[in-house]
Amino acid sequence: NAKRTLGTQMKATGEVMAISRSFECALQKALHSLEENKTSLLMSEYTGKSCDELLELLKNIDNTRLYVVAASIYNGISLGKIHDITKIDMWFLTRIENIVNMEKTLMTGACDRDTLLEAKRLGFTDDVIANDVGVSEASIKNLRRMWHITPSFSIVDTCAAEFKAE
């Protein structure tokens, strides 16, 4: 039974590795591979909180912090204020902001080709896009096919070319 507080001690839970062409996509892949059944950085249990509550929650260094950061951005708290409290580098906060802004765009129902392409580049799954836009997952898959937006997979050579990567 591991404590939720994060620190320098190794934990037996919550460790993932994700590789992608952008940080945003890798972060979302990592989120999806956690055994928490979370599909989005925007969790209603945090996005519905007041700014004062979020500012207080940002002080907690635990496994919910990423969701609290995303909810804070969603609710209009400045990256500078979040940085002052968390000391998270602005580079990372900007990347999280990119994800939050895209999800806000999707929640307006926007789903033109450029928006869908950018959402996929940022690592959004068809399921999350469909839920945010308010359509079926099949509709999103049909749009991807129509607009030739297809997933790609790359092989990662974990043996430094000692053996042929397959």
Task: Show the residue positions of the predicted features.
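ATP-dependent carboxylate/acyl-activation modules
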Residues: 1-166
